[in-house]
Regions:
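Short beta-strand/loop segment that forms part of the nucleotide-sugar
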Residues: 39-48, 69-74, 99
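Glycine-rich, basic loop-to-helix element that forms the pyrophosphate-binding segment
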Residues: 73-89
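Catalytic core of nucleotide-sugar-dependent glycosyltransferases
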Residues: 207-215, 220-247, 270-287
Length: 319
């Protein structure tokens, strides 16, 4: 009887929260189990799924034992789920993958090689949006942040999606894993806190992560909340790490933080996403993120919602 080679010791742990992802979770699991680099384990945290996800996960875990384990928690959200998975992770390198997304077969191998070849703590790659309602499906490779003003770039926008990076476990432990203080934007929060801890990042300029969209309602249902959470994350970073932003002129810093809120308010307004626009315009007034010229848009937003919508309609968007 032919002897099977012993599995490689675990070096990379992939943490995957799962909530009602039955149509997609098998593909997500298999993309991890099929990685070209050995020594990869998968920890899936079922976040109180009510569809067939749990049964699918247990069948897959049995097929891929001992490299895959399934944990369960009551519905708490993806960030508590990821923290639970981290507590059970055995690898010195950590990747995150949502249950409806996927990676190229060589993704973890190439990201790990980039970390091995440098002293970086984070390796990141390009990604592509796929599926119905995706806002553009052109593959995207982000810039080499190590050659830019990294603080400004990270404040401008979240630098990469949750599954487009591989991180040393020691760095994640040093910043305490994911914060659970906000409804959203806690992946962005993690990248900012990791940047404050270590500026050692390396880019792999290939598209190896794929983000699945599920139609136009994916973001818009809670867009205003995501914007306010992202603003809070930016402000918290600035307050906690003044040494990282001391080189930025005050006007530039304000444009990157408070200016983000007003930009998103106008974006929602001109897209006629008026529920979001009204909340964000009111928030801009409350937070002081406005100028005199903005008042012609902000003041109507203080009206009751039906009157605000009617006024915008009568003005053809020109409040």
């Amino acid at each position: 009887m032919e002897t099977q080679p012993a599995p490689l010791p675990t070096r990379i742990s992939v943490v995957m929260p799962c909530y009602n992802a039955a149509p997609y979770v098998r593909e997500a699991v298999e993309c991890v189990m099929g990685q070209t680099r050995g020594g990869v384990e998968l920890i899936v945290v079922d976040d109180g799924s009510t569809d067939a996800s749990r049964d699918i996960l247990h069948a897959l875990a049995a097929a891929h034992a001992p490299r895959m384990q399934v944990l369960h928690q009551d519905r708490k959200g993806p960030y508590p789920a990821r923290n639970l998975g981290l507590r059970h992770a055995g690898g010195s390198l950590i990747a995150f993958l949502d249950a409806d997304d996927y990676l190229s077969p060589d993704c973890l191998e190439k990201l790990a090689a980039a970390l091995d070849e440098t002293d970086a703590d984070i390796a990141y790659c390009g990604w592509q949006n796929v599926g119905e309602g995706a806002p553009g499906t052109t593959p995207y490779v982000p810039p080499d942040y190590a050659t830019l003003d990294t603080a400004a770039e990270f404040l401008r926008a979240c630098p990469w999606p949750i599954h487009a990076a591989l991180v040393r476990r020691a760095a994640i432990d040093a910043v305490g894993g994911f914060s659970e203080r906000c409804f959203s934007a806690m992946d962005y929060d993690l990248w900012l806190r990791l940047y404050a801890h270590t500026q050692k990042i390396v880019r792999v300029p290939e598209v190896m992560a794929f983000y699945r969209w599920h139609g136009g309602g994916q973001i818009s249902k809670t867009r205003w909340k995501q914007v306010l959470d992202a603003l809070r994350v930016r402000r918290d970073f600035v307050a906690a790490h003044p040494e990282r932003i001391a080189h930025l002129p005050a006007a530039r810093l304000a444009e990157l933080t408070d200016g983000y809120l007003l930009r998103e308010a106008y974006r929602a307004y001109w897209r006629r996403e008026l529920d979001d626009a009204q909340v964000l315009l009111r928030a801009a007034l409350r937070e002081g993120a406005w100028g005199v010229r903005d008042l012609k848009y902000i003041l109507p937003a203080l009206l009751p919602a039906p009157l605000f919508r009617r006024l915008v309609g009568l003005a053809g968007g020109q409040a």
